[in-house]
Regions:
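Short hydrophobic/aromatic-rich beta-strand segments that constitute the beta-sheet cores
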Residues: 35-36, 55-57, 91
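Glycine- and acidic-residue-biased ligand/ion/polar-headgroup-sensing regions
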Residues: 41-54, 58-59
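A short glycine-rich, His/Asp/Glu-containing loop-to-beta-strand
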Residues: 2-38, 42-43
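Short beta-strand segments
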Residues: 24, 34, 60-62, 101-103
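Short acidic-glycine-tyrosine-enriched beta hairpin
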Residues: 58-77
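Double-stranded beta-helix
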Residues: 2-7, 79-120
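A generic "binding-loop/recognition-motif" signal
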Residues: 30-32, 41-42, 60, 76, ...
Length: 120
Protein backbone atom coordinates (compact mmCIF):
# COMPACT_ATOMS: atom_id res chain seq x y z
CA UNK A 1 0.00 0.00 0.00
CA UNK A 2 1.26 3.47 -0.89
CA UNK A 3 1.73 6.11 1.79
CA UNK A 4 -0.56 9.15 1.69
CA UNK A 5 1.31 12.40 2.27
CA UNK A 6 -0.82 15.08 3.92
CA UNK A 7 -0.36 18.71 2.90
CA UNK A 8 -2.14 21.88 4.08
CA UNK A 9 -4.13 21.92 0.81
CA UNK A 10 -4.99 18.18 0.71
CA UNK A 11 -2.91 15.05 0.12
CA UNK A 12 -1.09 12.97 -2.45
CA UNK A 13 -0.05 9.37 -2.91
CA UNK A 14 2.86 8.22 -5.08
CA UNK A 15 1.58 5.36 -7.25
CA UNK A 16 4.76 4.77 -9.27
CA UNK A 17 8.28 6.17 -8.92
CA UNK A 18 10.70 5.45 -11.76
CA UNK A 19 14.02 7.13 -12.69
CA UNK A 20 12.53 9.40 -15.40
CA UNK A 21 8.87 9.63 -14.38
CA UNK A 22 6.56 9.56 -11.37
CA UNK A 23 2.81 9.00 -11.06
CA UNK A 24 0.77 10.52 -8.21
CA UNK A 25 -2.87 10.59 -7.18
CA UNK A 26 -3.53 14.08 -5.78
CA UNK A 27 -6.53 15.46 -3.90
CA UNK A 28 -7.01 19.21 -3.31
CA UNK A 29 -9.58 20.01 -0.61
CA UNK A 30 -12.55 22.31 -1.26
CA UNK A 31 -11.48 25.92 -1.74
CA UNK A 32 -7.84 25.13 -0.91
CA UNK A 33 -5.05 25.60 -3.41
CA UNK A 34 -1.42 24.70 -3.64
CA UNK A 35 1.37 27.20 -4.18
CA UNK A 36 1.67 29.32 -7.27
CA UNK A 37 4.79 27.56 -8.50
CA UNK A 38 6.92 26.20 -11.31
CA UNK A 39 9.45 23.41 -11.80
CA UNK A 40 12.88 23.71 -13.39
CA UNK A 41 13.38 20.04 -14.27
CA UNK A 42 10.04 18.37 -14.93
CA UNK A 43 6.83 18.65 -16.90
CA UNK A 44 3.48 17.51 -15.55
CA UNK A 45 0.41 15.93 -17.12
CA UNK A 46 -2.81 16.18 -15.09
CA UNK A 47 -5.79 13.92 -15.77
CA UNK A 48 -8.74 15.12 -13.68
CA UNK A 49 -10.68 12.10 -12.38
CA UNK A 50 -13.13 13.62 -9.88
CA UNK A 51 -14.48 17.04 -8.95
CA UNK A 52 -14.02 20.51 -10.31
CA UNK A 53 -11.49 23.26 -9.71
CA UNK A 54 -9.68 26.28 -11.05
CA UNK A 55 -6.37 25.85 -12.83
CA UNK A 56 -3.97 28.73 -13.29
CA UNK A 57 -1.32 28.52 -16.00
CA UNK A 58 0.88 31.61 -16.26
CA UNK A 59 -1.62 34.50 -16.03
CA UNK A 60 -4.73 32.60 -17.20
CA UNK A 61 -7.22 30.88 -14.87
CA UNK A 62 -9.93 28.51 -16.10
CA UNK A 63 -12.31 25.90 -14.73
CA UNK A 64 -11.21 22.27 -15.06
CA UNK A 65 -13.34 19.22 -14.24
CA UNK A 66 -13.43 15.42 -14.28
CA UNK A 67 -12.60 14.04 -17.72
CA UNK A 68 -10.35 16.95 -18.66
CA UNK A 69 -6.59 17.12 -19.02
CA UNK A 70 -3.90 19.77 -18.51
CA UNK A 71 -0.28 19.89 -19.62
CA UNK A 72 2.21 21.85 -17.49
CA UNK A 73 5.51 22.39 -19.37
CA UNK A 74 8.82 22.84 -17.58
CA UNK A 75 9.04 26.32 -16.00
CA UNK A 76 5.37 27.18 -16.54
CA UNK A 77 3.84 28.98 -13.55
CA UNK A 78 0.82 27.02 -12.32
CA UNK A 79 -1.60 26.38 -9.48
CA UNK A 80 -4.77 24.35 -8.84
CA UNK A 81 -7.63 25.18 -6.47
CA UNK A 82 -10.32 22.71 -5.43
CA UNK A 83 -13.96 23.55 -6.08
CA UNK A 84 -16.86 23.00 -3.68
CA UNK A 85 -16.20 19.22 -3.37
CA UNK A 86 -12.46 19.37 -3.99
CA UNK A 87 -10.67 17.90 -6.98
CA UNK A 88 -8.77 14.65 -7.57
CA UNK A 89 -6.33 14.11 -10.40
CA UNK A 90 -3.65 11.74 -11.60
CA UNK A 91 -0.36 13.55 -12.17
CA UNK A 92 2.37 12.14 -14.40
CA UNK A 93 5.70 13.88 -13.96
CA UNK A 94 8.42 13.50 -16.60
CA UNK A 95 12.03 14.59 -16.19
CA UNK A 96 13.92 14.90 -12.92
CA UNK A 97 11.11 14.19 -10.47
CA UNK A 98 12.35 15.38 -7.09
CA UNK A 99 10.09 16.95 -4.47
CA UNK A 100 12.52 19.84 -3.99
CA UNK A 101 12.02 20.99 -7.62
CA UNK A 102 9.31 23.44 -6.57
CA UNK A 103 9.86 27.18 -6.86
CA UNK A 104 7.02 28.80 -4.90
CA UNK A 105 5.97 32.29 -5.93
CA UNK A 106 2.93 32.58 -3.63
CA UNK A 107 1.75 30.32 -0.83
CA UNK A 108 -1.40 30.48 1.31
CA UNK A 109 0.20 28.48 4.13
CA UNK A 110 3.29 30.55 4.92
CA UNK A 111 5.81 28.26 3.25
CA UNK A 112 8.94 29.85 1.79
CA UNK A 113 8.52 31.63 -1.54
CA UNK A 114 11.04 33.01 -3.99
CA UNK A 115 9.55 35.89 -5.96
CA UNK A 116 12.95 37.05 -7.20
CA UNK A 117 13.75 33.95 -9.26
CA UNK A 118 13.27 34.27 -13.01
CA UNK A 119 11.56 31.25 -14.54
CA UNK A 120 12.65 32.05 -18.10
Amino acid sequence: MNVKIRKPWGMYEVLLDEPDYKVKKIYVRPYKRFSLQYHNHREEHWNIVEGIGTITQDDKSTTIRAGEYAYIPIKQIHRLEGGYKGITFIEIQRGICKEDDIVRLEDDFGRDTDKKVSHQ
